[in-house]
Swiss-Prot record:
This is Uncharacterized protein C1952.02. One of its GO terms (cellular component) is nucleolus. PANTHER family: G PATCH DOMAIN CONTAINING PROTEIN, PROTEIN PXR1. The keyword Repeat does not apply. GO terms for molecular function: RNA binding. It comes from the Eukaryota. It comes from Schizosaccharomyces pombe (strain 972 / ATCC 24843). Residues 142-163, 186-202 have a biased composition (Basic residues). One of its GO terms (biological process) is ribosome biogenesis. Its main location: nucleus. It is found in: Nucleus, Nucleolus. Keywords: Nucleus, Phosphoprotein.
């Protein structure tokens, strides 16, 4: 079995002194579990502060058997209760959260008049977002939409005409090539050899 004392002694450690300046004077010992209690069970009962607070509050209640009435005697806040509040207030878990103001929406809501809300049945009494627009704004929107549509139509027509022109130019080039080839073939076939190198049309 591994002995930490023997290991440290091999480096020149003496009991009661640190191996280096400012170091530990005793070896670190690991805790071992030899009992049959569940995981997380602690030896110190004082850590169960909620149970202690509950029992302290139960002791402050007095029941009279003569009248059958229950009387609560308050002797001020017990030290255990104060400690419990302190622990719950400054626990590690609750210190993680940040408390801030309420988050608000990023846009404003215009609601329907309250006179309309009174005539509506209670089932459908939800607040409704209504955006009020003036006549000028709506006409501006319509004009801008019409302008966009006209522009899109013009762009489409331009693209289409360009495509047709390109197609026409390509077809005309092809037709010219075909005509040239045909004319060359016909000119070759129509010529006959006459006395050596001269060619005469027949």
């Amino acid at each position: 079995m591994f002995s930490s004392k023997r290991y440290l002694n091999s480096f020149g450690w003496e009991e009661g002194n640190a191996l280096k300046e400012g170091g530990l004077t005793k070896p670190i010992l690991t805790s071992r579990k030899y009992n049959t209690h569940g995981l997380g069970a602690k030896h110190d009962i004082a850590d169960q502060w909620w149970d202690n607070v509950f029992s302290a509050q139960l002791q402050s209640i007095q029941v009279n058997t003569d009248n059958g009435k229950v009387a609560v005697q308050s002797n001020g806040v017990s030290t255990k209760l104060r400690m419990a509040k302190y622990h719950s207030k400054y626990s590690a878990l609750s210190s993680v959260f940040r408390y801030a103001g309420r988050l608000c929406g990023t846009f404003e809501e215009d609601l329907v008049d309250k006179s309309l809300d009174s005539s509506v049945s209670p089932v459908s009494s939800k607040k409704v977002k209504v955006r009020k627009t003036s006549g000028k704004e709506s006409s501006k929107r319509e004009k801008s939409k019409k302008k966009k549509e006209k522009k899109e139509k013009k762009d489409k027509l331009k693209k289409k005409s360009k495509r047709l022109k390109l197609d026409d130019s390509h077809t005309q080039k092809r037709k010219r090539k075909v005509r040239d080839k045909e004319s060359k073939k016909s000119s070759k076939s129509g010529l006959k050899k006459v006395s050596g190198t001269k060619k005469v049309k027949a």
